[in-house]
Amino acid sequence: MNLIGKWKVKELPVYPEPGKMIFVAVEDFPKYITDEDLLNDYMQQASFIYEFCEDGTVETMMPIPEEMMEKAKEQGAKIKDNYGVIDTTVWKEEDGKLFYDTKINGTVMDEPVSSFAEIKEAEDGTIRFNAGFTVLERE
């Protein structure tokens, strides 16, 4: 699979009741999320764009409102197509599988574990990112 390019959020997990998680399409959030503040948080996360670059990096980008653009530039924000880059990490292909660096380091039974998590592709061409909690589709 070729990851290069921009990906947008298609689905995020929603918890309609304690202990139950379902993935919900962005346009259906209001059906499942009734708290206005929580809905705003979800909509903000759903506006992120993820760009997988040929140099092996993936940039998480958030839209910058036009009235905030100059201030963001003055503060040194990296701006691409009216989006501010809020995180950059690396991705790689290894043994035919795709991985990205979660930047989470740790150990299991005193042995270090990799900070890389697999990016899984679904039959419909979407991918699971952010430890599987974000479903992305090509922009």
Where are these regions (language model features)?
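Lipid interaction determinants
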Residues: 1-139
